[in-house]
Amino acid sequence: MPKPAIKTAAKPATSSAGKRGKPNTPKSVAKPKTAKPKTASKPKVKPGEKKRLHPRNLHINGYDFPALMASYPKLKAFVRPTPYGALSIDFADPLAVKTLNAALLLHHYGLAFWDIPKGALCPPIPGRVDYLHYLADLLFEGGKVKRAAAIRALDIGTGANGVYAILGHQVYDWQFVASDINPQSLTNVQRIIDNNPSLQGHLSLRRQQDDKAVFKGIIQASDRFELTLCNPPFHGSLKEASEGSLRKVRNLQLNRGEQPKATSATLNFGGQAAELWCQGGEKQFLATMIRESQAFAEQCLWFTSLVSKQENLKPCYQALEKLGVDTVKTIEMQQGNKFTRVLAWSFHSQAKRLQWRNQIVSGT
């Protein structure tokens, strides 16, 4: 399948209305300034307005616990009525959350087996699949979103759960490379793949050997990806990560009218070290990712990452402008009381992006 011709990533857009040709600059004028990247974002949520999940998200109306228990009877042991007459689980109980995830992945996404080691990050499925739905919109740029087996995506820091790669394939038929620095995490994801025929041959795993690198050592010379995605570590130290986990558990208990308390047994938000924190936290991780992305610009159509902390966006924008990227987009998301956003950037013009995507989807 021939690939579209992509211009060298390091060449910035000129001031001539975004065209790649020679700018029409009068002789009396000094060198043209590099054009700022085109930016776009989703409308911000107004105060008091609740932003729902993505319209294609199967969980937009909450959990259907009777249906989930019918599909996955093990969930029954953890479901209980709430004071408001609904059914729910104790979201501060890691085993309950893990069992709910297994039920969701079986009932909605056809995954026969899913498990994670004790202490590994247990992700909320609705929020994870929301990111993927917005990436599909990003890739098709306002056009009709299609399932396409030719689309390749790279999941940076897949963790022991492998959820982004799993959901991306099950929902959109994308092919995934999933990377992680922790060999135990990759071993567990491989176990999930081995126990699900629908994943076999569609997910491949790569270990990151350098704890200071993001793309380097993972993206190979022959690779081409339509998307990269990442949920970066957001804490800067183990202490900070532990305090954040305890705070979330206490908030859950307060919301249920319970006396705040937390033990190691109740920390569903724990997660292994590489999943929750790194030196410099989210800000430094994003800075490294952006810096390294330039070297792989011709091989990747869109680079994306979740950004948990709003204040980390400004330095990202500044770094991307210095690199001369063509387009930067910020997509705001909300799951319950949690606000986050997707930062996306591409070194290619819209015309080049459409050419690339159309050749991939059409198979020409």
Curated annotation (Swiss-Prot):
The keyword Protease does not apply. InterPro entries: METTL16/RlmF, rRNA_lsu_MeTfrase_F, SAM-dependent_MTases_sf. It is found in: Cytoplasm. GO terms for molecular function: 23S rRNA (adenine(1618)-N(6))-methyltransferase activity. GO terms for cellular component: cytoplasm. Residues 1-53 are annotated as: Disordered. Disulfide bonds: none annotated. Keywords: Cytoplasm, Methyltransferase, rRNA processing, S-adenosyl-L-methionine, Transferase. Residues 1-17 have a biased composition (Low complexity). Its EC number is 2.1.1.181. It catalyses: adenosine(1618) in 23S rRNA + S-adenosyl-L-methionine = N(6)-methyladenosine(1618) in 23S rRNA + S-adenosyl-L-homocysteine + H(+). Residues 33-53 have a biased composition (Basic residues). It is an enzyme of class 2 (transferase). Gene3D superfamilies: Vaccinia Virus protein VP39 (3.40.50.150). GO terms for biological process: rRNA base methylation. Belongs to the methyltransferase superfamily. METTL16/RlmF family. Specifically methylates the adenine in position 1618 of 23S rRNA. This is Ribosomal RNA large subunit methyltransferase F. It comes from Shewanella sp. (strain MR-7).
